[in-house]
């Protein structure tokens, strides 16, 4: 409970002076003093009662209104933890009607509004409590973060400046951990593979810098490994610059086979450098010794090479970094200092970045419309459209040779420094200063004193923080450490996804019945019988038409739908209905919207776009439209897709829709479940028990405070 400091009223101070001057005051003076002190005590008790929701009244009997307020508050907390946020809002509003300025009720009312997607109302409630002196820095930070998130912006762009948040050094005291890190491959669970050129190995490292796995390649080991990429097949590919070959590994780093050999013919290479894979699964390798790019198919069969002089292009002199983006192949040359664009057949298209722009470009990765290039001690962002360059990070004046910069699952940029023998974790300055955004989302005390807590951990840009371990969390109850704290699980490790498919029943989309059937069947089959599939029809009155195993929908027919085609479709109600059923679903959950891309009149009459995106984001629900036509979707659908997790797909895209489910499964979800044994007195289940959670990661931390009720006895 927050302590309140106040000045005594002037009359009370005068009364105290009177007591000091007169040992035996007159009867009238004594009554005045007594009255003033009584008013003072009542004022103090009323101040302290503003954070109790009527659950307690220190030094006096509770009033009837306080009793009613506490009962409604209890029901509100229980509804909140059930995921019934609208019900929780009603209960907290009722509680507030009995205690109109209670800060604890205002805090929880704001939480319920926030989870319901009504962020404006949440902020108003929190600000009211904060202005009453409640919450301190913790409440102030929450208000700032939520306010900032309502202003959308690019997570990575030309103005993004990154600074070091921590590092993984190659030496731990006198112990060698790895030598000369040259590239890295971040994974969806927060871990990363690091290629160690000097120690000839591949290391898997968690977010705390602990090596959890080492891979040394085939029996005879790697021969100066230089780059690693993840293939669409799920396997990994490593280039061996001294071995003049590529090594194919399984996801656990086990060797499968070699690709390529030493030489100058097709399928051969001398000093292979960096790797890329295009949308068709073809593999591109910068062949430094042969001054060209070698191309293999997805099975490792040699196709061709390119890089010799052609119209408008003088030929490679020292090809290094390479990236495949939307049908274009981009190659950096460390002799000419430029970046060149080709098509997938090796035909020269243009010089994206003029020569002599870079001093010594190395690895090059695509990220959000930019190429991220390492050049000496700098990380440079290159606009894919214009070729304009922007400095995104710099290591300073110490000896440095940055060789790769790759975005990870937590919104950081992982930078390998071969010369200083470190892997830097770089983040935006405001993230480093602002810390982590931690929320206690659910507390289950049904088996008290065993308590299970569900937490979400995000950065200030609403990006999930994944890969945390038990050592990253510290739980307390009433500021005292809990007993037997354990990390039960992390959502990022969950391989099961619950999916709700919304079928647009507008007249426009109804003309694409065959496409809808194909999409539902493909998505259902891709779920492989795991998780729960729901089908919601967006008609004049949205309705859930199916809930159960995905297997039953693998032979879906459009004729089984009961919801009629409608000229007007309240899409907002369909989206809310779909999301409501996912609140208590698997930790990984998503809505897939099948539509021709248009919206009807009054599609967002009850709920606005910002409220819908907040509802999805604040409950970790991804949104992916599958368009039945090749045209662009209406701006409303595009807004929903751009401001939630997930992305848009075309129903008949070359890769099919099966990878959509994998894409959704691989989205980062920063939710964690911990347990502990409580030592608090429940007062027969009537006491509101406190719980505090702190999360630490490198130089950042975050905190949240909440509470719960044990079962009534």
Task: Indicate where each model-derived feature is located.
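VWA/integrin I-like adhesion module and closely mimicked acidic/polar interface patches used
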Residues: 596-643
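Acidic, polar low-complexity linker/tail segments
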Residues: 434-437, 443-500, 507-512
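C-terminal "exit" segments of structured domains
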Residues: 431-434, 444-451, 642, 652-713
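Beta-rich, blade/repeat-based domains predominating
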Residues: 174-188, 219-232, 264-278, 311-326, ...
């Amino acid at each position: 409970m927050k302590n309140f400091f106040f000045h005594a009223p002037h009359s009370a101070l005068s009364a105290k002076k009177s007591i000091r001057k007169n040992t035996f005051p007159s009867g009238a003076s004594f009554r005045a003093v007594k009255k003033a002190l009584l008013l003072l005590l009542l004022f103090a008790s009323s101040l302290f009662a503003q954070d109790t929701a009527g659950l307690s009244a220190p030094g006096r009997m509770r009033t009837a209104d306080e009793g009613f307020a506490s009962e409604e508050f209890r029901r509100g907390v229980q509804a909140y933890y059930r995921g019934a946020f609208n019900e929780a809002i009603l209960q907290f509003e009722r509680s507030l009607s009995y205690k109109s300025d209670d800060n604890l009720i205002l805090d929880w009312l704001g939480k319920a509004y926030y989870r319901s997607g009504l962020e404006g109302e949440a902020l108003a409630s929190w600000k009211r409590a904060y202005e009453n002196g409640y919450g301190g820095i913790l409440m102030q930070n929450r208000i700032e973060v939520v306010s900032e998130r309502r202003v959308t912006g690019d997570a990575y762009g030309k103005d993004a400046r990154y600074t070091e948040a921590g590092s993984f050094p190659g030496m731990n005291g006198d112990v060698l951990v790895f030598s000369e890190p040259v590239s890295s491959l971040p994974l969806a669970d927060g871990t990363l593979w690091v290629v160690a050129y000097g120690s000839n190995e591949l290391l898997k490292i968690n977010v705390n810098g602990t090596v959890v796995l080492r891979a040394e390649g085939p029996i005879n080991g790697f021969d100066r490994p230089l780059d690693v990429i993840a293939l669409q097949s799920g396997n990994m590919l490593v280039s061996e610059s001294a071995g003049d070959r590529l090594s194919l590994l399984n996801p656990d780093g086990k060797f499968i086979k070699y690709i390529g050999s030493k030489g100058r013919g097709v399928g051969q290479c001398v000093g292979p450098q960096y790797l890329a894979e295009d949308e068709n699964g073809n593999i591109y390798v910068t062949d430094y010794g042969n001054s060209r790019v070698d191309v293999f198919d997805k099975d490792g069969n040699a196709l061709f090479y390119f890089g010799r002089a052609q119209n408008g292009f003088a030929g490679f002199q020292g090809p290094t970094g390479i990236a495949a983006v939307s049908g274009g192949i981009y190659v950096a040359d460390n002799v000419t200092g430029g970046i060149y664009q080709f098509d997938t057949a090796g035909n020269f298209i243009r010089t994206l970045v003029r020569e002599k722009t870079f001093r010594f470009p190395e690895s090059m990765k695509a990220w959000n419309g930019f190429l991220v290039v390492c050049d000496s001690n700098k990380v440079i962002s290159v606009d894919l459209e214009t070729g304009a360059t922007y400095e995104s990070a710099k290591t300073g004046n110490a000896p440095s040779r940055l060789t790769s910069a790759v975005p990870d699952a937590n919104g950081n940029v992982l930078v390998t420094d071969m010369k200083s023998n470190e892997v830097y974790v770089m983040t935006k300055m405001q993230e480093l200063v602002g810390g982590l955004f931690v929320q206690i989302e659910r507390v289950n005390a049904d088996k008290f004193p065993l308590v299970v807590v569900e937490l979400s951990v995000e950065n200030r840009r609403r990006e999930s923080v994944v890969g945390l371990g038990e050592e990253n969390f510290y739980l307390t109850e009433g500021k005292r450490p809990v007993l037997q704290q354990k990390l039960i699980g992390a959502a990022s490790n969950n391989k099961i996804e619950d999916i709700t498919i919304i079928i647009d029943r507008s007249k426009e989309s109804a003309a694409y019945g065959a496409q809808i059937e194909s999409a539902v069947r493909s998505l259902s089959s891709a779920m492989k019988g795991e998780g729960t599939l729901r089908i919601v029809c967006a008609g004049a009155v949205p309705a859930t038409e199916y809930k159960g195993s995905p297997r039953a929908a693998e032979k879906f027919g459009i004729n089984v739908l009961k919801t009629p085609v409608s000229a007007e479709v309240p899409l907002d109600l369909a989206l809310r209905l779909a999301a409501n059923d996912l609140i208590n679903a698997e930790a990984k959950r998503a809505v897939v919207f099948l539509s021709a891309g248009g919206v009807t009149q009054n599609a967002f009459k009850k709920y606005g776009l910002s409220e819908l995106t907040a509802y999805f984001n604040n409950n970790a629900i991804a949104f992916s439209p599958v368009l039945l036509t090749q045209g662009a979707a209406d701006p409303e659908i595009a807004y929903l897709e751009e401001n939630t997790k997930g992305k848009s797909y075309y129903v008949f895209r070359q890769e099919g829709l099966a990878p959509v489910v994998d894409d959704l499964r691989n989205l980062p979800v920063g939710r964690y479940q911990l347990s502990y044994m409580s030592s608090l007195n429940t007062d027969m289940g009537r006491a509101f028990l406190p719980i505090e959670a702190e999360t630490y990661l490198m130089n950042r931390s975050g905190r949240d405070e909440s509470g719960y009720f044990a079962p009534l006895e």
